[in-house]
């Protein structure tokens, strides 16, 4: 998120790295770690495009607004299944190319395939019989959904082995490990900013004029162009890293039993011995993600639909309004990423001043709740302005600034959400008798399961209240407020 998958790879990282530290004679030079970490920029570029542009694209293809969240189920499902599985098998990979490089290369190639399917879904669908004037382009939707799921699986195939490769290169050196992961986070921020900047540029398709076709309008052509840049960046940094950095072939030791316990078997076993502090952490984390997930999926759609008053299924003027809002929303996400990066650098100092991690988490959840609730005010102001100035009127500078301010402010609680829960899980694990990897694995379930619940639940809620994004944001605000209270009162 950006991002959503950065959290889902924690489980695989701990497990993969721990079994490979002895395979290298010593830590590798920092320049090699930076080369591997740079792959994160390519990965996150694609994730930024997913979060900012793909939900509106789904609706342009004709998927009803209330059902589009089901397509996003791939994120939590693949985070729950793919990353741990990839970690499990990469630990045991005996390829002459090394443990991690085969999975990283496979993930990059799958991303390329997925990008072609997603970007050309409308064209493929049209060539297979979809009518341009029909609101639902079923063949294009099927092709898009296939490409979308492949993209999520591919990104998950990349994330875990990349972080595990950094652990291998650090070879047990704690300082090098922290430095390598810091660079990985840095390149994630770089990818986010690049992705959101590309998504906010409305004339990108002019660089690739062939992207605009009879079945693919300007918005669709811009999406294609963004993904072409994304896959180019990813392939370049991946090829450089895999060529430059050696990944030694692994052979199991003769005296090793090479245990076959499934990864999830170990995670579920941790529930039997889990103590109260960990349960409280899981509750706060789950509530936190119930709050976050609707906004992370529908933030740019909210900007295009509620703030700008556009409609992805309306006439050309309404579509133009909607597209303008989407691109301003992408700018908001770029501001969000910048704030997130800045705040992340100061979390430790802020935590000390405010009185500890749980107080900091509780405080920023209040910010999250207020910001989500304020989307209602911004929406009502935009609707009032359109009633006075006309339905095609653009939002005033004040309304637009208010919406962008919410995007930026939400970078503060997002930075805490990406760090504090995992730090608390590590602290709790040291006194509970559970290993850090198991604790983080259980915490990961408290992230992806709420995402699935939200994916199934927000559609009916929206339909019950007449459609739009505000009902899900209000539910998120309530969940954030409850999460704040629980964090202040029951966290250790």
Curated annotation (Swiss-Prot):
GO molecular function per UniProt: sucrose transmembrane transporter activity; symporter activity
GO biological process, one term: sucrose metabolic process
Gene Ontology cellular-component terms listed: plasma membrane
Extracellular-side segments: 55-68, 123-139, 203-224, 299-324, 381-403, 466-469
Catalysis performed (reactions): sucrose(out) + H(+)(out) = sucrose(in) + H(+)(in)
Topology of the protein relative to the lipid bilayer: Multi-pass membrane protein
Pfam families per UniProt: MFS_2
Activity regulation statement: Inhibited by protonophores (e.g. carbonyl cyanide m-chlorophenyl-hydrazone (CCCP)), but not by SH group inhibitors (e.g. p-chloromercuribenzene sulphonic acid (PCMBS)).
Residues modified to Phosphoserine: 17
Transmembrane segments: 34-54, 69-89, 102-122, 140-160, 182-202, 225-245, 278-298, 325-345, 360-380, 404-424, 445-465, 470-490
Alphabetical keyword list: Cell membrane, Membrane, Phosphoprotein, Sugar transport, Symport, Transmembrane, Transmembrane helix, Transport
Primary residence: membrane
Family annotation (InterPro entries): MFS_trans_sf, Suc_symporter_pln
Pathway assignment: Glycan biosynthesis; sucrose metabolism
Residues on Cytoplasmic side: 1-33, 90-101, 161-181, 246-277, 346-359, 425-444, 491-492
Record-linked PANTHER family: SUCROSE TRANSPORT PROTEIN SUC7-RELATED, SUGAR TRANSPORTER
Family: Belongs to the glycoside-pentoside-hexuronide (GPH) cation symporter transporter (TC 2.A.2.4) family.
Protein's job: Responsible for the transport of sucrose into the cell, with the concomitant uptake of protons (symport system). Can also transport maltose at a lesser rate. May also transport biotin.
Name the record gives this protein: Sucrose transport protein SUC8
Organism phylogeny: Eukaryota, Viridiplantae, Streptophyta, Embryophyta, Tracheophyta
Gene: SUC8
């Amino acid at each position: 998120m950006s991002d959503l998958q950065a959290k889902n790879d924690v489980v695989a990282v701990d497990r993969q790295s721990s079994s490979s530290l002895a395979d290298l004679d010593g830590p590798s030079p920092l320049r090699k770690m930076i080369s591997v970490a740079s792959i994160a920029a390519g990965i996150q570029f694609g994730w930024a495009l997913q979060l900012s542009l793909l939900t509106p694209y789904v609706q342009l293809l004709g998927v009803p607004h209330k059902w589009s969240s089901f397509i996003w189920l791939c994120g939590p499902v693949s985070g729950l299944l793919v990353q741990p599985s990839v970690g499990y098998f990469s630990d045991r990979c005996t390829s002459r190319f090394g443990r991690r490089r085969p999975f990283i290369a496979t993930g990059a190639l799958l991303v390329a395939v997925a990008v072609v399917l997603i970007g050309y879904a409308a064209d493929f669908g049209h060539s297979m019989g979809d009518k341009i004037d029909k609101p639902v382009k079923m063949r294009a939707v099927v092709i898009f959904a296939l490409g979308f799921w492949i993209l999520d699986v591919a990104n998950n195939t990349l994330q875990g082995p990349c972080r595990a490769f950094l652990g291998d290169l650090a070879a047990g050196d704690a300082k090098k490990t922290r430095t390598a992961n810091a660079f990985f986070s840095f390149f994630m921020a770089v990818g986010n900013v690049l992705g959101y900047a590309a998504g906010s540029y409305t004339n990108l398709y002019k660089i690739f004029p062939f992207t605009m076709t009879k079945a693919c309008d300007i918005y669709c052509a811009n999406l294609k162009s963004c993904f072409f840049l994304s896959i180019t960046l990813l392939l370049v940094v991946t090829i450089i890293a895999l060529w430059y950095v050696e990944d030694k072939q692994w052979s199991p030791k003769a005296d090793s039993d090479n245990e076959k316990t499934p990864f999830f078997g170990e995670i579920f076993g941790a529930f039997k011995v889990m103590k109260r502090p960990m349960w409280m952490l899981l509750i706060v984390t789950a509530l936190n993600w119930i709050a976050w997930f609707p906004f992370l999926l529908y933030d740019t759609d909210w900007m295009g639909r509620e703030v700008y008053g556009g409609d992805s299924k309306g006439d050309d003027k309404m579509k133009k309004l909607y597209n303008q809002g989407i691109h301003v929303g992408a700018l908001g996400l770029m501001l969000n990423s910048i704030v997130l990066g800045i705040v992340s650098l100061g979390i430790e100092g802020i935590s000390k001043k405010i009185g500890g991690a749980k107080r900091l988490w509780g405080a920023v959840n209040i910010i999250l709740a207020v910001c989500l609730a304020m989307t209602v005010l911004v929406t009502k102001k935009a609707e009032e302005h359109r009633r006075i100035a006309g339905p095609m009127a653009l939002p005033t500078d004040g309304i637009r600034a208010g919406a962008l301010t919410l995007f930026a402010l939400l970078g503060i609680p997002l930075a805490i959400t990406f760090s504090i829960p995992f730090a608390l899980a590590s602290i709790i694990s040291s006194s509970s008798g559970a290993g850090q990897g198991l604790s983080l694995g259980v915490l990961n379930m408290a992230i992806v399961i709420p995402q699935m619940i939200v994916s199934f639940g927000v559609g009916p809620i929206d339909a019950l209240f007449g459609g739009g994004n505000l009902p899900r944001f209000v539910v998120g605000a309530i969940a954030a407020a409850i999460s704040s209270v629980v964090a202040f009162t029951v966290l250790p």
